[in-house]
Amino acid sequence: VRLVHLADLHLGFRQYHRLTPDGINQREADVALVFRRAMERVIALRPDVVLIVGDVFHSVRPMNAAIIEAFVQLQTLRLALPETEVVIVAGNHDRPRATETGSILELFSCIDERVHVVAAGYKSITLASCDMSVLAVPDLPAGAPWPEFEPDTRRAYNVVALHGEVEGMLPPNLAYPDRPIRPIPIDVIGPERWNYVALGHYHVHKKMAPNMYYCGSLEYLPPNMWSEMHEERATGVPGKGFIEYDLDGGTHRFHPIA
């Protein structure tokens, strides 16, 4: 069984005043373009599962163009890969702070029954087609208890998809906004008990344990673009992209996109 792990798409992100010939903010167009390239690569890889681990959008109320872009690309993915399961969790940028606001991410669950969205509160999702359980943990409100990280022993494969800060995420002396009251200790998650732990929130591809990774964002974005480039050069990470992971062989491959 193979999965693809993406995170921190930040569709709808805008910066500066430069426009494309079509009148779209240039940085918004850049972010949409790398997402399309990533989806094309994912379709070519034909994985069994696609995990999108938070911050699909840059804001809770994205512009219509960003919503349409995400919907079209996800629908294209599902049409091209009808047997592939898709799991989407909310991140700190696209999780509503008030329950009554609702989440635009729920729209994608309408594509078909193989698109699973967890926008508020953690949830275990059973993917019967590949005998897998996914513990989906979106960005949690400040002070909310951590879930019980317990694999489902009835399933052949157990995976965590978590958007948030895990202890050791940041290099020493690097400040980062939107930090939780306390990061999650790695031993609370217990990656050795899972087949794979997919993380989102940090924009640099980073190995936290042999089977536990931040995949990083697909494009260079604030707040720490220059620090990210420095870290990538220091650790030999070839830019931005996503992860392909083989659950049977425990093998990891990073696919650069930007």
Where are the model-predicted features located?
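A structural signal for the main folded, soluble domain(s) of proteins
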Residues: 1, 31, 36-44, 135, ...
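Conserved beta-strand elements of the Class I
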Residues: 4, 133-135, 241-243
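Cap/insert and terminal regions of metallo-dependent hydrolase folds
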Residues: 26-35, 186-189, 195-198, 229
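Glycine-rich, flexible loop segments associated with nucleotide phosphate handling
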Residues: 26-28, 32, 86, 184, ...
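Binuclear metal-dependent phosphoesterase catalytic core
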Residues: 123-128, 215-258
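Structural beta-strand/beta-sheet cores of well-ordered domains, especially the beta-sheet scaffolds
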Residues: 7, 158, 195, 210, ...
